[in-house]
Amino acid sequence: RTRCCALIKSKNKNVLIDTSPDLKQQLIKNKINNIDKVFYTHHHADQTHGINELRFFYLKNRKKIDIYTNNLTKKYLLNSFGYCFKKNREYPPILQNNSLKKKHSYKDNGKIISLKSIKVEHGNIDSICYVINNKLAYASDVSKIHKKDLKSLNNLKYLVIDCLQYNYHPSHYCLTDILLLIKNIKPKKTILTNLASSIDYNHIKKKLPKNVIPAYDLSLIH
Protein backbone atom coordinates (compact mmCIF):
# COMPACT_ATOMS: atom_id res chain seq x y z
CA ARG A 1 0.00 0.00 0.00
CA THR A 2 1.13 3.59 -0.59
CA ARG A 3 1.96 6.16 2.08
CA CYS A 4 -1.16 7.90 3.33
CA CYS A 5 -2.52 11.31 2.51
CA ALA A 6 -6.08 12.52 1.95
CA LEU A 7 -8.03 14.63 -0.52
CA ILE A 8 -11.04 16.77 0.40
CA LYS A 9 -12.92 16.94 -2.88
CA SER A 10 -15.86 19.30 -3.39
CA LYS A 11 -17.52 20.42 -6.61
CA ASN A 12 -14.80 22.84 -7.77
CA LYS A 13 -11.97 22.51 -5.24
CA ASN A 14 -9.44 19.88 -4.28
CA VAL A 15 -7.71 20.28 -0.91
CA LEU A 16 -4.91 17.92 0.12
CA ILE A 17 -3.92 16.78 3.57
CA ASP A 18 -0.18 16.02 3.31
CA THR A 19 2.00 15.29 0.29
CA SER A 20 3.17 11.70 0.57
CA PRO A 21 6.18 10.42 -1.41
CA ASP A 22 3.63 8.45 -3.47
CA LEU A 23 1.63 11.56 -4.33
CA LYS A 24 2.21 11.49 -8.09
CA GLN A 25 0.94 7.93 -8.38
CA GLN A 26 -2.03 8.76 -6.12
CA LEU A 27 -2.98 11.83 -8.16
CA ILE A 28 -2.80 9.93 -11.45
CA LYS A 29 -4.82 6.97 -10.20
CA ASN A 30 -7.52 9.29 -8.82
CA LYS A 31 -7.49 11.49 -11.96
CA ILE A 32 -6.89 14.67 -9.95
CA ASN A 33 -6.25 17.60 -12.29
CA ASN A 34 -5.93 20.44 -9.80
CA ILE A 35 -4.90 21.13 -6.20
CA ASP A 36 -6.08 24.34 -4.52
CA LYS A 37 -4.63 24.08 -0.99
CA VAL A 38 -2.59 21.74 1.18
CA PHE A 39 -2.87 21.25 4.94
CA TYR A 40 -0.02 19.40 6.66
CA THR A 41 -0.27 17.16 9.71
CA HIS A 42 3.46 17.18 10.54
CA HIS A 43 6.93 17.32 9.01
CA HIS A 44 7.98 13.67 8.72
CA ALA A 45 9.18 12.45 5.32
CA ASP A 46 6.25 10.09 4.73
CA GLN A 47 3.88 13.06 4.84
CA THR A 48 5.95 15.75 3.08
CA HIS A 49 8.35 14.34 0.49
CA GLY A 50 5.89 14.44 -2.39
CA ILE A 51 5.81 18.23 -2.17
CA ASN A 52 7.54 18.75 -5.52
CA GLU A 53 4.61 17.05 -7.30
CA LEU A 54 2.67 20.27 -6.64
CA ARG A 55 4.85 21.99 -9.25
CA PHE A 56 2.65 20.69 -12.07
CA PHE A 57 -0.37 22.55 -10.67
CA TYR A 58 1.59 25.78 -10.33
CA LEU A 59 2.77 25.52 -13.94
CA LYS A 60 -0.77 24.76 -15.07
CA ASN A 61 -2.37 27.73 -13.28
CA ARG A 62 0.62 30.10 -12.83
CA LYS A 63 -0.55 30.64 -9.28
CA LYS A 64 1.17 29.76 -6.02
CA ILE A 65 -0.53 27.04 -4.00
CA ASP A 66 -1.38 27.92 -0.40
CA ILE A 67 -0.08 25.47 2.17
CA TYR A 68 -0.84 25.50 5.91
CA THR A 69 1.68 24.27 8.46
CA ASN A 70 2.62 24.41 12.12
CA ASN A 71 5.94 26.05 12.99
CA LEU A 72 8.03 22.87 13.01
CA THR A 73 6.70 21.77 9.63
CA LYS A 74 7.27 25.25 8.19
CA LYS A 75 10.89 25.23 9.34
CA TYR A 76 11.49 21.75 7.93
CA LEU A 77 9.93 22.50 4.54
CA LEU A 78 11.81 25.79 4.15
CA ASN A 79 15.11 24.09 5.00
CA SER A 80 14.55 20.99 2.88
CA PHE A 81 12.54 22.36 -0.05
CA GLY A 82 13.47 26.03 -0.07
CA TYR A 83 13.32 26.17 -3.88
CA CYS A 84 9.54 25.67 -3.64
CA PHE A 85 9.20 28.94 -1.69
CA LYS A 86 12.02 31.24 -2.80
CA LYS A 87 12.72 32.66 -6.22
CA ASN A 88 15.98 31.62 -7.86
CA ARG A 89 17.44 31.43 -11.36
CA GLU A 90 16.35 27.86 -12.00
CA TYR A 91 12.90 27.54 -10.43
CA PRO A 92 10.02 29.91 -9.69
CA PRO A 93 8.46 29.66 -6.22
CA ILE A 94 5.37 27.46 -6.36
CA LEU A 95 4.07 27.57 -2.78
CA GLN A 96 2.88 30.17 -0.30
CA ASN A 97 3.24 29.11 3.33
CA ASN A 98 0.53 30.11 5.81
CA SER A 99 0.46 29.62 9.57
CA LEU A 100 -1.96 26.97 10.70
CA LYS A 101 -4.87 28.30 12.77
CA LYS A 102 -7.33 26.46 14.99
CA LYS A 103 -10.07 26.98 12.41
CA HIS A 104 -10.01 27.42 8.64
CA SER A 105 -12.81 27.57 6.11
CA TYR A 106 -13.28 28.07 2.39
CA LYS A 107 -16.23 28.32 0.03
CA ASP A 108 -17.06 26.17 -2.95
CA ASN A 109 -20.25 26.46 -4.99
CA GLY A 110 -21.97 28.38 -2.19
CA LYS A 111 -21.07 25.84 0.49
CA ILE A 112 -18.60 26.37 3.34
CA ILE A 113 -16.06 23.65 4.10
CA SER A 114 -14.57 24.03 7.58
CA LEU A 115 -11.43 22.48 9.04
CA LYS A 116 -10.68 22.49 12.74
CA SER A 117 -7.08 21.65 13.67
CA ILE A 118 -6.43 19.72 16.88
CA LYS A 119 -2.93 19.22 18.21
CA VAL A 120 -2.21 15.57 19.07
CA GLU A 121 0.91 13.73 20.15
CA HIS A 122 2.90 11.65 17.67
CA GLY A 123 5.65 10.20 19.81
CA ASN A 124 7.84 13.13 20.86
CA ILE A 125 6.42 15.64 18.34
CA ASP A 126 3.06 17.27 17.67
CA SER A 127 0.89 16.24 14.77
CA ILE A 128 -2.44 17.68 13.62
CA CYS A 129 -5.82 15.99 13.58
CA TYR A 130 -8.22 17.72 11.18
CA VAL A 131 -11.97 17.76 11.80
CA ILE A 132 -13.87 18.51 8.60
CA ASN A 133 -17.35 20.05 8.82
CA ASN A 134 -17.66 18.55 12.32
CA LYS A 135 -18.42 15.21 10.65
CA LEU A 136 -15.11 13.59 9.80
CA ALA A 137 -11.83 13.53 11.73
CA TYR A 138 -8.53 12.65 10.06
CA ALA A 139 -5.61 11.72 12.34
CA SER A 140 -3.02 9.85 10.30
CA ASP A 141 -0.19 9.93 12.87
CA VAL A 142 -1.13 9.93 16.54
CA SER A 143 -0.07 8.27 19.76
CA LYS A 144 -2.19 10.34 22.16
CA ILE A 145 -5.22 12.63 22.00
CA HIS A 146 -5.52 15.03 24.91
CA LYS A 147 -8.64 14.64 27.07
CA LYS A 148 -9.65 18.27 26.55
CA ASP A 149 -9.94 17.64 22.80
CA LEU A 150 -12.03 14.48 22.92
CA LYS A 151 -15.26 16.50 22.99
CA SER A 152 -14.45 17.74 19.47
CA LEU A 153 -14.41 14.11 18.32
CA ASN A 154 -17.65 12.94 19.91
CA ASN A 155 -20.29 11.29 17.71
CA LEU A 156 -18.52 11.83 14.40
CA LYS A 157 -19.88 10.32 11.23
CA TYR A 158 -16.38 9.14 10.29
CA LEU A 159 -13.12 8.75 12.21
CA VAL A 160 -10.06 8.10 10.02
CA ILE A 161 -7.23 7.21 12.36
CA ASP A 162 -3.68 5.89 12.59
CA CYS A 163 -3.39 2.15 13.30
CA LEU A 164 0.20 1.18 12.63
CA GLN A 165 0.12 -2.30 14.14
CA TYR A 166 -1.72 -4.64 16.50
CA ASN A 167 0.45 -4.00 19.57
CA TYR A 168 1.94 -1.00 21.37
CA HIS A 169 4.12 1.47 19.50
CA PRO A 170 5.54 4.66 21.12
CA SER A 171 4.65 6.95 18.19
CA HIS A 172 1.42 5.49 16.80
CA TYR A 173 -1.90 4.16 17.95
CA CYS A 174 -2.26 0.41 17.83
CA LEU A 175 -5.48 -1.54 17.43
CA THR A 176 -5.99 -1.88 21.19
CA ASP A 177 -5.75 1.91 21.62
CA ILE A 178 -8.30 2.55 18.89
CA LEU A 179 -10.88 0.09 20.18
CA LEU A 180 -10.73 1.83 23.56
CA LEU A 181 -10.97 5.27 21.94
CA ILE A 182 -14.05 4.50 19.87
CA LYS A 183 -15.87 3.16 22.92
CA ASN A 184 -15.40 6.64 24.38
CA ILE A 185 -16.15 8.96 21.44
CA LYS A 186 -18.57 6.67 19.54
CA PRO A 187 -18.04 7.50 15.85
CA LYS A 188 -20.56 5.94 13.49
CA LYS A 189 -17.75 4.47 11.39
CA THR A 190 -14.00 4.19 12.00
CA ILE A 191 -11.48 3.74 9.20
CA LEU A 192 -7.97 2.56 10.06
CA THR A 193 -5.17 4.17 8.08
CA ASN A 194 -1.35 4.23 8.07
CA LEU A 195 -1.37 0.44 8.42
CA ALA A 196 2.07 -1.19 8.46
CA SER A 197 2.87 -3.72 5.74
CA SER A 198 2.83 -6.41 8.44
CA ILE A 199 -0.96 -6.01 8.73
CA ASP A 200 -2.84 -8.08 6.20
CA TYR A 201 -6.10 -6.46 5.05
CA ASN A 202 -8.26 -9.58 5.18
CA HIS A 203 -6.77 -10.78 8.47
CA ILE A 204 -7.41 -7.53 10.35
CA LYS A 205 -10.86 -7.13 8.81
CA LYS A 206 -11.98 -10.37 10.47
CA LYS A 207 -10.89 -9.05 13.88
CA LEU A 208 -12.79 -5.75 13.71
CA PRO A 209 -16.28 -4.72 14.86
CA LYS A 210 -18.77 -4.09 12.04
CA ASN A 211 -18.38 -0.31 12.23
CA VAL A 212 -14.55 -0.43 11.95
CA ILE A 213 -12.84 -1.09 8.63
CA PRO A 214 -9.24 -0.97 7.34
CA ALA A 215 -8.51 1.66 4.70
CA TYR A 216 -7.09 0.74 1.31
CA ASP A 217 -5.59 2.73 -1.54
CA LEU A 218 -8.23 4.90 -3.27
CA SER A 219 -10.67 4.61 -0.35
CA LEU A 220 -13.63 6.98 -0.83
CA ILE A 221 -15.81 8.55 1.87
CA HIS A 222 -18.95 10.39 0.81
Where are these regions (language model features)?
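Active-site metal-binding motif and surrounding structural segment of the metallo-beta-lactamase
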Residues: N14-T69, N155-K157
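Active-site neighborhood of phospho(di)ester-bond hydrolases with catalytic His/Asp-centered motifs
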Residues: L16-S20, D36-D46, T69-N70, L136-V142, ...
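Glycine-rich nucleotide phosphate-binding loop and flanking beta-alpha elements
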Residues: L23, D46, K75, N167, ...
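Active-site neighborhood of divalent metal-dependent phosphoester bond hydrolases
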Residues: N61-I65, T73-N97
